[in-house]
Amino acid sequence: MMMMTRKYILFLLFLSIPVVMTAQDKDFGIWYGISAEHKLTKKLEIDLLTNVRTFRNASKLDEAFIEGGITYSMYKHISIAGSYRLTKSIENNDSYYFRHKYMLDLKGNIPAGNFNFSGYLRFQTAVKTYIKDENDKFPSYTGKIKLKAIYKTPTFPLNPYIYIETFCPMFSAKSGTIEKNRFSAGVELSITRHNSAEVEYIFQRDYQPHISDINIISINYKLKF
């Protein structure tokens, strides 16, 4: 088990090293998030979160959203979730418009000693209210995969983690390509049994319409009740 754990961590670390390419654009942003989750029953949980994201060297608002969802635990380590996100984001005309996003997840987690490995497969659809051309009138579909490894420090409230995320367009001319990747390393601070905070660094590479990179500092506060 320990050997498999080490191999898995090395695999994630390898994937978290961005491929060296010449990006046409490089940027920096800061993300701020607050989330809350509440167990309704042993198998049913509701979640609510809000997030504000900046770009252009953290000088301009990129998007802000609020999201609500529900998770059902089918088995001990497998669950399904559905959520809705209302976003106000900047568009090509430098003005802000609403977007509606609907998400369906299949989640899993595997504990291994002080480590916990988790991930999910997501199918999501987004609907724009900013219509620039004919394609904007129709929903866009995206598949997403996330893999995460966290080490639960036994005697200290700081838990380091890494994760990767990949986004792929679906049901379009761009199907079979990668839209963007995220590689992240961070630390979780356990404040109390029901409160925690996270600080993480994210490297995001967008491939469409051209290669562009953004370095992100993400700060999150989490509440469980």
Language model features by range: what are they?
Residues M1-F28, F225:
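Bacterial Sec-dependent N-terminal signal peptides
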Residues T22-D25, T54-S59, E91-Y97, K132-F138, ...:
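Outer-membrane beta-barrel domain signature
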Residues Q24-A81, T87-I90:
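Start-of-domain marker
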Residues F28-I30, D62-A64, F98-Y102, K137-G143, ...:
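Residues that define the transmembrane beta-barrel architecture of outer-membrane proteins
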Residues I34-H38, G68-Y72, L104-G108, I145-Y151, ...:
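Residues on the lipid-exposed face of transmembrane beta-strands in outer-membrane beta-barrel proteins
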Residues K43-L48, H77-G82, G113-F117, T155-N159, ...:
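Repeated loop/turn-to-beta-strand initiation elements of outer-membrane beta-barrel proteins
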Residues T50-R56, Y84-I90, I110-A112, F123-V127, ...:
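Transmembrane beta-strands of outer-membrane beta-barrel pores
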Residues I162, F171-K174, I178-F225:
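Predominantly the C-terminal beta-signal and adjacent terminal strand-loop region
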